[in-house]
Swiss-Prot record:
Biased composition annotated in UniProt, kind: Basic residues: 773-785
Region Disordered, annotated ranges: 137-157, 729-810, 832-873, 972-1055
Topological domain spans for side Cytoplasmic: 1-228, 281-302, 353-361, 501-1083
Gene Ontology molecular function: inward rectifier potassium channel activity; voltage-gated potassium channel activity
UniProt PTM comment: N-glycosylated. N-glycosylation mediates traffick to the cell membrane but is not necessary for voltage-gated potassium channel activity.
Biological process, per Gene Ontology: potassium ion transmembrane transport; potassium ion transport; regulation of membrane potential
Species in which this protein is naturally found: Homo sapiens
Sugar attachment sites: 421, 428, 436
Subcellular localization, as worded in the UniProt entry: Cell membrane
Intramembrane segments: 454-474
Name of the protein in its database record: Voltage-gated inwardly rectifying potassium channel KCNH3
């Protein structure tokens, strides 16, 4: 754990000071806020006050500090006004009055109002203390404190029964927290004296400044840190020189006295002495984390901890030589106690344990220092082995082995006189003392430098390994020390080099994590077979994001921090975005909420940040790099640093789609403001939401949400797939008329049902629609034409549908078999002699005759659908199919002819001869009576509709049908009908008409009459039925004049001996199309 610096943040210790200074006397108090004029609400309530009054803290908080809730009937009104006046004028006030507890019991109270000022000199708080003085007032006072139910006196002194004594914060808890539990009887006496006599100095409600003497050093200050650096160097010097001076001292000097100390030794001793003095004036950190500045507390703390060790280490052994005091060898060993100062370095160096390089350096220094100590001891053992020998020198010591190898052997000589000079052997490891008291002197041996280096080599080889054997232990003492050295070496090797390994791994941890994640990413790409372009994008994005955040997960890192601190960090990280003019009107709380919604984003070159059509979920602020906005390959905008992209603020449930792509040009760093978090923040601060919405429109560099819908409409309108159908739908909606005809698919053929003598109307146009099949009346059984088809066909001009008006065909003659015939479309017949089946529409005037099929092209006026590749390859199959369909059609026609002939015969035999109604043309009289029974109209009752056989009177066909009731005309449909040529005609005249009337809506009797045919007219032949009477009129002239072609009754009716068809007639117009007979169908 790093050393604690202590809690040095400025604090407001007002509450602790109040609890300490006014303990006992002012323990029952409340604090009122003087800034809220008029009310002065209570902001703090002591437990003693709650104990006195019986009110809980929750009941007292935010009430007036005048404590009007304690007033009762005996409370003086004058005192009330004086308290109010003192609070309003921010003055001190003291009074005695009667207050009431929560239980309703009165007590005498000494009330003291004291204003508390802040650092600006303004009154910030009111200290209102309450002291129970009921006992003092009751002594000799009137007897008015008796209870109602008894004669025993009841004093107003509050008891502690029923209350939790641990909650007495003003007297116990706060007093303990302030660190003043020491008994201070004198201080209490002075405070009590000050309450009743002199007033004590009141604390101020402000941040307390650090109170310290100018001669007190802060333990974590710069001056003390510099001094600790000098002490560290001095301690290291002592750790190196003291073992060397003790163990590797020259033995040639006399043992009676030692030489003078060096300058470095004297400087180190002076530093140690000054360090003791400074330690008495240096702050320390208490167990509660507070920094103690009191000199008395500092001295007491230092004396009880490190003082004794520092005094022993600072004994001036070297200074004794300056005062001519001899220091013998035994006393000189006391300098090794200075090595204990190394223990003081551990707490100071612990604060640097977070730096790997510093820890690595310290570990290596410790290992080298231990090796130096082992080398000094090894040299001392070898020296003592030689000096302890008798008359003959030992031959097995490590120094003897070294001397023989270096050819500098040891030898004994007689002791020289005191003033004699050494014979040049002052640099070797010889001893100048007497050998065992024999008067012999040891000389020779290796030099001191060679001996120390060899000893250090042995120490390092023994600590790091088991040694190499070139310097070995020979004597018992040397072997024992070698064993101890190996044990220490094993421990140091594990500790030092284990820590070194951990430190090196920690130094390369980020690099290892990078390679590990890269390897995982490549394995993922290989397993899932990611394509090469996507693989390159993944690797580039990973490398770019790693370069930005160095692999640190900021979300996880900040999650452990409190919300307040995390918001401040987020505001610092996103200050570029929050400094936009868009947020200048936001409060600090709103900015903090918005900063938590911001997320960093990154975009690589060529990467798409947003695709067209994506749902916009955030606003993006470009911090660095450049981007471009694309739409259909066109660059709409280029964005750079400081640009804001996104959309206007949508509603919470609204989804806005992007109208363009946003692509990165370079490596871009962005800040992303999520719309969900933005909505949540604006919901907390609704006053800022309107200004933000208005400002966002002007701050957006490019609005990705503008015109999204119109862009989609434009794109769809350019599509050419459904252009014709879209045009028809528009005309159908707007009610516009035009000659547009929508194409019909091949599987929905339409056949023309109009005869040459009929003209088209809206109903006919609808029947000609390519998506509808012309309805045919079912003649078998009880069937009848569908009512739905009749309703749509006979709607008439009174209620024309808008769709039919838009699809009305232009008037044009059609003198050839129409190409819309089902047989032509299906490929059964060859239209106009053409061998190729085609699907065409006539959009212009055709030629007078269609002897050959016109060539397709723009000038022909035909919309053709050519064969596909598959149809060309299957020509033979289509020919066979066409032939089979033709044969089947012929069989069906023959069967129909037989059924129709049979039906006619049955109806003529079974139907009674009576007058049937006939429609009357406008302006004509009643129908003439029938003169012949065979010429009367024949009515056949089929059970569903009445069918009347009528002569083809021209007035009936050309006239206007009268309608007795307003609205659409009755559902009547005249149909021409001709018998097959194989049967003799049962009719006395050329043609008869079937008139179907609805059972539910019969025609009025006045509008129906019998109109027999003229018996004198001969029956027309087949040729006469086709060409008309002797006065021929060309079909072209009839078409141009709008009148029907001549024939029986003024209308030429089709007559096909091979078939029986029903064609809608009676809807002539002057400008409609004249249809010719289709060969082979009888239409």
């Amino acid at each position: 754990m790093p050393a604690m610096r202590g809690l040095l943040a400025p604090q407001n210790t007002f509450l602790d000071t109040i609890a300490t200074r006014f303990d006992g006397t002012h323990s029952n108090f409340v604090l009122g806020n003087a800034q809220v004029a008029g009310l002065f609400p209570v902001v703090y309530c002591s437990d003693g006050f709650c104990d006195l009054t019986g009110f809980s803290r929750a009941e007292v908080m935010q009430r007036g500090c005048a404590c009007s809730f304690l007033y009762g009937p005996d409370t003086s009104e004058l005192v009330r006004q004086q308290i109010r006046k003192a609070l309003d004028e921010h003055k001190e006030f003291k009074a005695e009055l009667i207050l009431y507890r929560k239980s309703g019991l009165p007590f005498w109270c000494l009330l003291d109002v004291i204003p508390i000022k802040n650092e600006k000199g303004e009154v910030a708080l009111f200290l209102v203390s309450h002291k129970d003085i009921s006992e003092t007032k009751n002594r000799g006072g009137p007897d008015r404190w008796k209870e109602t139910g008894g004669g025993r006196r009841r004093y107003g002194r509050a008891r502690s029964k029923g209350f939790n004594a641990n909650r007495r914060r003003s007297r116990a808890v706060l007093y303990h927290l302030s660190g003043h539990l020491q008994k201070q009887p004198k201080g209490k006496h002075k405070l009590n004296k000050g309450v009743f006599g002199e007033k004590p100095n009141l604390p101020e409600y402000k941040v307390a400044a650090i109170r310290k003497s100018p001669f007190i050093l802060l333990h974590c200050g710069a001056l003390r840190a510099t001094w600790d650096g000098f002490i560290l160097l001095a301690t290291l010097y002592v750790a190196v020189t003291v073992p060397y001076s003790v163990c590797v001292s020259t033995a040639r000097e006399p043992s009676a006295a030692r030489g003078p100390p060096s300058v470095c030794d004297l400087a180190v001793e002076v530093l140690f002495i000054l360090d003791i003095v400074l330690n008495f004036r240096t702050t320390f950190v208490s167990k509660s984390g507070q920094v103690v500045f009191a000199p008395k507390s500092i001295c007491l703390h230092y004396v009880t901890t490190w003082f004794l060790l520092d005094v022993i280490a600072a004994l001036p052994f070297d200074l004794l030589h300056a005062f001519k005091v001899n220091v013998y060898f035994g006393a000189h060993l006391l300098k090794t106690v200075r090595l204990l100062r190394l223990l003081r370095l551990l707490p100071r160096l612990d604060r640097y344990s977070q730096y790997s390089a510093v820890v690595l350096t310290l570990l290596m220094a410790v290992f080298a220092l231990l090796a130096h100590w082992v080398a000094c001891v090894w040299f001392y053992i070898g020296q003592r082995e030689i000096e302890s020998s008798e008359s003959e020198l030992p031959e097995i010591g490590w120094l003897q082995e070294l001397a023989r190898r270096l050819e500098t052997p040891y030898y004994l000589v007689g002791r020289r006189p005191a003033g004699g000079n050494s014979s040049g052997q002052s640099d070797n490891c010889s001893s100048s003392s007497e050998a065992n008291g024999t008067g012999l002197e040891l000389l020779g041996g290796p030099s001191l430098r060679s001996a120390y280096i060899t000893s250090l080599y042995f120490a390092l080889s023994s600590l790091t390994s088991v040694g190499f054997g070139n310097v070995s232990a020979n004597t018992d003492t040397e072997k024992i020390f070698s064993i101890c050295t190996m044990l220490i070496g094993a421990l140091m090797h594990a500790v030092v080099f284990g820590n070194v390994t951990a430190i090196i791994q920690r130094m390369y941890a980020r690099r290892f994590l990078y390679h590990s994640r890269t390897r995982d990413l490549r394995d993922y790409i290989r397993i899932h077979r990611i394509p090469k372009p996507l693989k390159q994008r993944m690797l580039e994005y990973f490398q770019a994001t790693w370069a930005v955040n160095n692999g640190i997960d900021t979300t996880e890192l900040l999650q452990s921090l409190p919300d307040e601190l995390r918001a401040d960090i987020a505001m610092h990280l996103h200050k570029e975005v929050l400094q936009l003019p868009l947020f200048e009107a936001a409060s600090r709380g709103c900015l903090r909420a918005l900063s938590l919604a911001l997320r960093p984003a990154f975009c690589t070159p060529g990467e798409y940040l947003i695709h067209q059509g994506d749902a916009l979920q955030a606003l993006y602020f470009v911090c660095s790099g450049s981007m471009e906005v694309l739409k259909g390959g066109t660059v709409l905008a280029i964005l750079g640093k400081g640009d804001l992209i996104g959309c206007e603020l949508p509603r919470r449930e609204q989804v806005v789609k992007a109208n363009a792509d946003v692509k990165g040009l370079t490596y871009c760093v962005l800040q992303c403001l999520q719309l969900a978090g933005l909505h949540d923040s604006l919901a907390l601060y609704p006053e800022f939401a309107p200004r933000f919405s208005r400002g966002l429109r002007g701050e957006l560099s490019y609005n990705l949400g503008a015109g999204g819908g119109s862009a989609e409409v434009d794109t769809s309108s350019l599509s050419g797939d459904n252009t014709l159908m879209s045009t028809l739908e528009e005309k159908e909606t707007d009610g516009e008329q035009g000659p547009t005809v929508s194409p019909a698919p091949a599987d929905e053929p339409s056949s023309p049902l109009l005869s040459p003598g009929c003209t088209s109307s809206s109903s006919a146009a609808k029947l000609l629609s390519p998506r509808r099949t012309a309805p045919r009346p079912r003649l078998g059984g009880r069937g009848r034409p569908g009512r739905a088809g009749a309703l749509k066909a006979e709607a008439g001009p009174s209620a024309p549908p808008r769709a039919l008006e838009g699809l009305r065909l232009p008037p044009m003659p059609w003198n050839v078999p129409p190409d819309l015939s089902p047989r032509v479309v299906d490929g059964i017949e060859d239209g106009c002699g053409s061998d190729q089946p085609k699907f065409s529409f006539r959009v212009g005037q055709s030629g007078p005759e269609c002897s050959s099929s016109p060539s397709p092209g723009p000038e022909s006026g035909l919309l053709t659908v050519p064969h596909g590749p598959s149809e060309a390859r299957n020509t033979d199959t289509l020919d066979k199919l066409r032939q089979a369909v033709t044969e089947l059609s012929e069989q069906v026609l023959q069967m129909r002819e037989g059924l129709q002939s049979l039906r006619q015969a049955v109806q003529l035999v079974l139907a009674p001869h009576r007058e049937g109604p006939c429609p009357r043309a406008s302006g004509e009289g009643p129908c003439p009576a029938s003169t012949s029974g065979l010429l009367q109209p024949l009515c056949v009752d089929t059970g569903a509709s009445s069918y009347c056989l009528q002569p083809p009177a021209g007035s009936v066909l050309s006239g206007t049908w009268p309608h007795p009731r307003p609205g659409p005309p009755p559902l009547m449909a005249p149909w021409p009908w001709g018998p097959p040529a194989s049967q003799s005609s049962p009719w006395p005249r050329a043609t008869a008409f079937w008139t179907s009337t609805s059972d539910s809506e019969p025609p009025a009797s006045g509008d129906l009459c019998s109109e027999p045919s003229t018996p004198a007219s001969p029956p027309p032949s087949e040729e006469g039925a086709r060409t008309g009477p002797a006065e021929p009129v060309s079909q072209a002239e009839a078409t141009s004049t709008g009148e029907p072609p001549p024939g029986s009754g003024g209308l030429a009716l089709p007559w096909d001996p091979h078939s029986l068809e029903m064609v809608l007639i009676g809807c002539h117009g002057s400008g409609t199309v004249q249809w010719t007979q289709e060969e082979g169908t009888g239409v």
